[in-house]
Amino acid sequence: MGKRVVATDKELKWKKVDIPDTLDDFGGFYGLEEIDGVDVKVVNGQVQFIASEAQVKEEEESSESDFPDFDAMEQEDDGDVEEAEEEEEEEEDVAEADEPEVKQKQEQARVEQIDKGVDSEKHEDEKETPEDDLATNVFDIDVDLSDVGSGELPGWTDTVDLSMTTINGLSNLGFTEMTPIQKLSIPAALEGKDIMGKASTGSGKTLAYGIPIIEKMIKSKDNLRTNGIIFTPTRELAQQVTKHLQNVCSMLLKKNPYMILSLTGGLSIQKQERLLKYDGSARIVVATPGRFLELIEKNEELMKRFAKIDVLVLDEADRLLQDGHFDEFEKILKHLGRIRKSLKNMEYWQTLIYSATFSTDLFDKLANSSWKKKNNSKDESEMESVLKHLMTKINFKSKPMMIDANPEDKISAQIKESLIECAPLERDLYCYYFVTLYPGTTLIFCNSIESVKKLNAYLINLGINSFQIHSSMTQKNRLKNLEKFEAMASKNNHLGKPTVLIASDVAARGLDIKGIKHVVHYHLPHSADTYIHRSGRTARGDNEGVAVMICSPQEAMGPLRKLRRLLASKEQISKSTKNKKWQQTVPLLPIEIDILQQLRERSSLANDIAEHELASRSLRKDSNWLKQAADELGIDMDSDEEDKDIILAKNKNKKMNKTLDKNELKSMKAELTHLLKIPIRKDMRRSYLTGGLVNLADSLVKKRGHHNIIGHEKTDALNVLKKGKSNKKQKTK
């Protein structure tokens, strides 16, 4: 053991601590150092370190490192200097003790001089900002708005009194005018009234409830309080609402990027818990009920914090009407309501409810043959009957103000509907025909995940850029595919090529995907409300769009008739007769048989290859699963034993029948590649390019006409349906 001496913390030989890169957050611990074999004593309130001479720096080394940096000087006090002097006096070598004392006095003089400079700088800062609120309250900061004036948005400022932050955000996003639902609901929401609002899809409901919450947040004096919570039925919609509100508040987010926070499943709960601890975070929360309930049940403090909100929003609230949906949401209301009642001098929060559909009839299964309506009183509207149902689940501050921006139409007038009648096994062919003839961005909805996977593989085999999203995919993969789809769509729009997104009903509600021209219902949806929300993915804002149903004769006789009757306006119902054929109220999409016939062979090959790919992939998965289960149980699994299970054997045989051998698969792929190289021609014309009604040679040279079909003019599904409607009107006259 070497001789032990008393030393300061700066005289010790500290070792740097390397923090592993795998740690997500260091919790503020940066530049850590450690030392072993040092005793710590507290004498008269002063900390002393007793270490061996080997652990203490040499005099020259310590004099260089001991010179305090700016931050250390600011924090050093007289007690530290006195402690250093006492330790110096305890040194054995008295002859050399005078030099450190001189150095100590010189350093002390420098510290005092720099401290004076720091104090003078602080005084200058205080003179520049005399009001403490300016330094602490983010929302009271005077933001430079020289480029934007309230006169630039008279469509907003003439109706409601908004902050400059909101006006600037709306101006940057190009929202110069209010939509009908915004005009009707925002003034009432700013007054603190409970609202139940109904408007067609794509009509601006997000801002109708978002702006009142943003205004409350800006005017709030408490920067740590959550002002509003927005609940959405799907994760994708929650992400979209969050981005939309963040774009409006982009100026405020420069100071605090986590002010508007999304809390959804499928993403790291640890990261969300960490973000909630940051000062000023989660002023506005956009959440799905499952993840929100998980967070508040783990943390009582979070529950108390969220119980003090000003506004509670339910987006796409009609889902609460469906029995068995969102038990988590009812638990959330009980938890928050219980704490809210215990708080003194706090009235109940403001509740805003919005959706495109508020009718209990719309939730009935279309396959159900019953045509009887709910037993509502004659004077009671659909929204009033829905409100009665909601009041059993939700506590309102007062009776909600009911706002219906489109009382007559259930489907937006900007959506042109159409029907394709085909055999049940020809849905794929007609999908291929539609995206070939009408290139652009198309969203196809299927009722099952297997159909989504198969149709995606089928279109990819035909050389079409296709992407898929469904509930079996992880949240990250869904968002990635949406981003890829949007990027590819912007590229293909210039080239005249189709871009397709195939989805299950996970994408039906609320998702605002830019530039969707067509929505195709590969299957007829199970309920009318799903049809409304699916079709509403097109014709967003002021744009127009097309919704096409692919329907078999069996569906046309039952579910389609019921769907069209439920979607009919009151005027249409009053004029109808008992034997009215409701399926004929939607126009048929014109089909060009010559083009369809050219697509039939390549469609059949692509279908067989797609079925092989899915079946072989599924067989591999099943085999791996069985082997893994057998290994975990310590059992030897033979193929003979697998065949003894009747269900497994049937399932396996069904998939085996869809698979192809290597040579057959190779041959079919080669044949399909050859067919795809053959251009599709209008009227099957192969010679005399300059003859006929259309000069094909001239069109080819001047790059006019259809991108995918030779001799065909550029067509747009929207214009085709508009022309068909106008021709029908002329015939009736």
UniProtKB/Swiss-Prot annotation:
UniProt catalytic activity: ATP + H2O = ADP + phosphate + H(+)
Motif (DEAD box): 315-318
Listed SUPFAM superfamilies: P-loop containing nucleoside triphosphate hydrolases
Acidic residues biased stretches: 58-99
Enzyme class: hydrolase
Domain Helicase ATP-binding: 186-376
GO CC field: cytosol; nucleolus
EC nos: 3.6.4.13
Positions of short motif Q motif: 155-183
Matching Pfam families: DEAD, Helicase_C
PROSITE patterns from the UniProt entry: DEAD_ATP_HELICASE, HELICASE_ATP_BIND_1, HELICASE_CTER, Q_MOTIF
General function of this protein: ATP-binding RNA helicase involved in the biogenesis of 60S ribosomal subunits and is required for the normal formation of 25S and 5.8S rRNAs.
Family according to the record: Belongs to the DEAD box helicase family. DDX24/MAK5 subfamily.
Protein name: ATP-dependent RNA helicase MAK5
Organism: Candida glabrata (strain ATCC 2001 / BCRC 20586 / JCM 3761 / NBRC 0622 / NRRL Y-65 / CBS 138) (Yeast)
Gene from which the chain derives: MAK5
